[in-house]
Amino acid sequence: MFNKKEKNMREDTEKSVVCNHHRISFLGLLVTLGIVFGDIGTSPLYVMKAILHTGETIDESTILGALSCIIWTLTLQTTIKYVCVALRADNNGEGGILALYALLRRLKSKWIYILAIIGASTLLADGIITPAITVTTAIEGLESISPDLPVIPITLAIITIIFFVQRFGTESIGKSFGVFMLLWFLLLGVVGAVSITSYPMILKAFNPYYAVVLLTQSPEWFLILGAVFLCTTGAEALYSDLGHCGRKNITISWAFVKTMLILNYLGQGAWVLNHVPTALSVNPFFSIMPQSMLIFAVIMATGAAIVASQALISGTFSILSEAMNLHFWPRMRIKHPTHVKGQLYIPMINLAMYIGVVLIILLFRDSSHMEAAYGLAITITMLMTTLLLGFYLHSKGVARVFTLLFMGTYCTIEAIFLAANLSKFLAGGWCTMLIGGILFLMMYVWVRAMKIRRHYVCTKPLDDYYQIISDIKADESIPKYASNLVYVNHADKDGAVDDKLLYSIINKQPKRADHYWFINMEFVDTPDTLEYSCKTLVPDTLYSVTMHIGFRIEPRVSLYLRQVVEDLVASKKVDLKSTYPSLRKNGIPGDFRFIIIHRVYYPESSANRQQNLLMSFYTLISKIGIDEPKALGLDTSIVVVERVPLIINQRNRSIRRITQIVNKKEEQKEKGCL
């Protein structure tokens, strides 16, 4: 038996560029600014404006209270929860809600996947509203220069360019994102600090007393808190990008980013208190800019919005790629536009996001209305992350008191934010909730349907069929089907095989081959695992290969099997030269043919109403995906797909023979005639 474990099969074409940035260095910190903080770094564009539009009376206590809420939200939510706690809950260096779920999947909980798909679906919904609100707000800054400029057409043009360039990758321009975001954050901090000097008393906002006063005495505290929450919406993206930059780089960069953000928020607050009568009609972000810098500020804001949008789009591709390997989402065509590791492009998702962003811009028309749609979905994502972090801390043996304190504190905080954001439901929050709800339904149906499909796959012990497979190979009266016949085996148990696979070899059309290969695909909980183990079941005849693939790795079975075979040939465990004399004499290897057993749901089976509904939706959802050969990265020219029915709860009813009844009737007729 040949058993080669821990065999790395990484493609040589991929460059692990991102991994080099995990080391603490100026370059690593610069890259982190460009990748991680785009979303949270553009929040000053609209947070203070959203607070002013809540209808609360604008006075010192209101502004100090709102700013205090912002400072302590960034501290409690972003710094403590995400930077100090969540970044330590990494899955071999990867972060994000699905990576966290993959760590917990081994707990065998029947419902924990629900938390993961709720969080993932709402995070994806947030990814549609973010490009719309950031780019629109940035372009609205032009109204300070020329009120007649067409904001919507300019915004749509920029959005179109952002999504169009995805197909080419962003490797060339991505290197400059870090430098640009460094300049952006310096602009935020310097302009904010200058504005603070006009109203130094604004520094009292560091005292949480003012936040408590606002939340206990203001009748509009719910609306204000909903607007305040927008300052931390990028925290979840910060956790998701852990694998790109590393925990230490993110932690150090956050200290700089947080300082610049707070300076800018305080500067906006100082300007508002100095211009109370006119503050409601303008965006304080652009108002604190010197008139001579206004055009420069709009250009910088637009650039920062583009960086934030790019990060959200790339993040969406990564999340869905993980969801595919975790069996939360149908397999879709994935492209790699550059050689940078982890940079993906999913054409259908890119188009769907583009249409969604355009519709949101056309529906809400301006950033003030978009603010109502923003924040609700991501609050739910954060709440799901808190629950999963609680399970993670418990699984790691963290003191029960600390785990309960953590979960209790953050569930309470996020439940309050959720309640505050629900007040915006009718004003626009319904939009992202609708998108998130549709995505959740699709993921839930896909997970349940996949479980049903696996449950009704009948398996048989493979060792019972060693002899007959060997006999078929030796039977020259059977036409040779292929030199090497490869099956993808979906049986979960070790040593078992899908009965339809055996039926294909033995019964349907006996298939003679020189070598039979059974491939098992095991998607593991770690992100970048790419290993295989191989067993020789019948020498020179039957082989079983198990491929262990991480949830961030795209399956490419043809490529991986070729590397497995090369290893076997090099170790002289198998002779792959063609058995045809003319080809063998010239050292030509035998051909390969793949057979995929595809089960098609049979509606007439005796499935209950719930199963029938799930499978019907599953069939509909599967149409957005690609077929299994393409999903597995197979060369479709050498693939045969055999379709068999998937029958649930089959109840066979015997057909009754009526020959004797017919004979009796004929006898009676004859007697009547007599």
Predicted regions and their residues:
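The structured alpha-helical core of multi-pass membrane proteins
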Residues: 2-674
